[in-house]
From Swiss-Prot:
Names of the cofactor(s): Mg(2+)
HAMAP family: IPP_trans
Protein source organism: Nitrobacter winogradskyi (strain ATCC 25391 / DSM 10237 / CIP 104748 / NCIMB 11846 / Nb-255)
EC number(s) recorded for this UniProt protein: 2.5.1.75
Record-given protein name: tRNA dimethylallyltransferase
Length: 314
C-alpha cells in the first residue's frame, strides 16, 4: 500500500497518527497531509483543547485552521477538568463523522495517553463524586503528596509503586479512585474500554528531532510566545482565580507566569522556568512513547512524511 491518497478508501488505512515531543513540527506535517488528502486534523494534545490558551499551547493559528478542517481544538473552557475519557468520547464522534465522509482522520499531538487510548483502549473508571475529589484535594493541600502516597500504598500498593511520591496529580487521582470505588486504579485499567483504532488499522509516526536542536527550538518558541502576548493570555486566566489543580492551570508556563504576575518572580525567571519545564516534558515524551507505544515508527521530522507514505498499516 503506497501513498496516502484518500481515494484508496477507508479500508486501506483508517487513520494517520502523528506524535512527537513539543515543538517537533507535528502540526505542520498534519496540515500538509490534510491539504494533500482532503483529511481532517484531529487534536490529540491535552492542552490544546483549551480555548483560553491558544498562544501558550501553540495551537494552530486561525489562518492554519482555515486551510483544512481542524477538530477538538479550543473547544473546552479552562474551568473544565477535561480527562482522557472525555477526549475519547469527543474523538469517537469526530472519527465516526470523518470516516462517514470518506475523509482521512489525522490525529496529531503529544499526549501519549490519548494515543494509547486510541490504539490500546482506556480504563473504564466511573466519575468520581465531587465530595470525594474535594476531600482528597483538601488533604493534598494540608498534608502533602508524600503523605497521601503513604495512604495510597496501604490501599493500592501496586499503583503506589508505579508513582513518584511527590507526583501530586497522579497520587491524588489514584487515591480518589480507590476511595470512591473500592477498587484500585490498576484494577480499573485491567478492565478497560476497547481501542478506538486498533494498531493494525493505522499508520503511526513519532517525530524524533535531534535533542539539542529541539531544545533550542523550545527555548526560541517560548520567547516568541511571550512576544505574541502569552503573558496577557495568562493574566486573563489568572483573573478568574481557578483551581490551580485544573489541567489548564498546569500548562507549561502558566504557573510561573502567574507567579510573575503576582510579583513573586521576574519575567525573565518565569520564562526560564517555562522553558526548563517544557524541555523536561519533551524528554519525558521521548521516554514514554519508546516504552508505552513501540508500534509508532520513529523518524526525523524531515523524513516523517516519506515514512508515512511507505509504511503499511500496522
Amino acid at each position: 500500500m503506497g501513498g496516502l491518497n484518500r481515494d484508496e478508501g477507508v479500508e486501506a488505512t483508517d487513520a494517520v497518527l502523528i506524535a512527537g515531543p513539543t515543538a517537533s513540527g507535528k502540526s505542520a506535517l498534519a496540515l500538509s497531509l490534510a491539504e494533500q488528502t482532503g483529511g481532517v486534523v484531529i487534536n490529540t494534545d491535552s492542552m490544546q483543547v483549551y480555548r483560553n490558551l491558544r498562544i501558550l499551547t501553540a495551537r494552530p493559528t486561525p489562518d492554519e485552521e482555515a486551510r483544512a478542517p481542524h477538530r477538538l481544538y479550543g473547544h473546552v473552557d479552562a474551568s473544565v477538568n477535561y480527562s482522557a475519557g472525555r477526549w475519547v468520547a469527543d474523538a469517537t464522534a469526530v472519527l465516526n463523522e470523518t470516516l462517514a465522509k470518506k475523509r482521512l482522520p489525522i490525529f496529531v499531538g503529544g499526549s501519549g495517553l490519548y494515543f494509547k487510548a486510541l490504539t490500546r483502549g482506556l480504563s473504564a473508571v466511573p466519575p468520581i463524586p465531587p465530595e470525594v475529589r474535594n476531600d482528597v484535594r483538601a488533604r493534598l493541600e494540608r498534608d502533602g503528596a508524600e503523605a497521601l502516597h503513604a495512604v495510597l500504598a496501604r490501599c493500592d500498593s501496586e499503583t503506589a509503586q508505579r508513582l513518584r511520591p511527590r507526583d501530586r496529580s497522579r497520587v491524588a487521582r489514584a487515591l480518589e479512585v480507590v476511595e470512591a470505588t473500592g477498587r484500585s486504579l490498576t484494577d480499573w485499567h485491567r478492565d478497560g474500554l476497547p481501542p478506538l483504532l486498533p494498531a493494525e488499522r493505522v499508520r503511526a509516526v513519532f517525530l524524533a528531532p535531534e535533542r539539542d536542536a529541539l531544545y533550542a527550538r523550545i527555548d526560541a518558541r517560548f520567547g516568541a510566545m511571550l512576544a505574541a502576548e502569552a503573558l496577557e493570555e495568562v493574566a486573563a486566566l489568572a483573573e478568574r482565580r481557578l483551581d490551580p489543580l485544573l489541567p489548564a492551570m498546569k500548562a507549561h508556563g502558566v504557573p510561573a507566569l502567574i507567579r510573575h504576575l503576582r510579583g513573586e518572580i521576574s519575567l525573565e525567571r518565569a520564562a526560564e522556568i517555562g522553558r526548563a519545564d517544557t524541555r523536561h516534558y519533551a524528554k519525558r515524551q521521548f521516554t514514554w512513547f519508546r516504552h508505552q507505544l513501540p508500534e509508532f515508527i520513529w523518524a526525523a521530522p524531515a523524513e516523517a512524511r516519506q515514512v508515512l507514505e511507505r509504511a503499511e498499516a500496522r
